[in-house]
Amino acid sequence: MKINKLTLNERKNDILSYFGEINAPCRTSEVAEHLGVSAYQARHYLQCLEKEGKIKRSPVRRGASTLWEISSIPP
């Protein structure tokens, strides 16, 4: 039985493509559903992309869902 495991870079590229398709901020749960992974795993991938400066999270208010979006590219 072959198990298809995507690398971290493949997952991150998939997330960036997803953001490009929807062209709107989205929640961690939406990314998790798109990837078919747990919210915990999706959050890990999103945090990696955030550290790389490729995406950013919206300002978080108490009790509000975290929204993620593509970082604006400087001119």
From Swiss-Prot:
> Any keyword Transcription?
yes
Q: Is Membrane there in the keyword field?
A: no
Source organism, top-level taxon: Bacteria
Gene Ontology BP terms = regulation of DNA-templated transcription
Write out the entry's keywords from A to Z: Fimbrium biogenesis, Transcription, Transcription regulation
What does this chain do? May have a possible regulatory function on the expression of the other daa genes.
Could you identify this protein by its name? Answer: F1845 fimbrial adhesin operon regulatory protein DaaF
Q: Which gene encodes it?
A: daaF
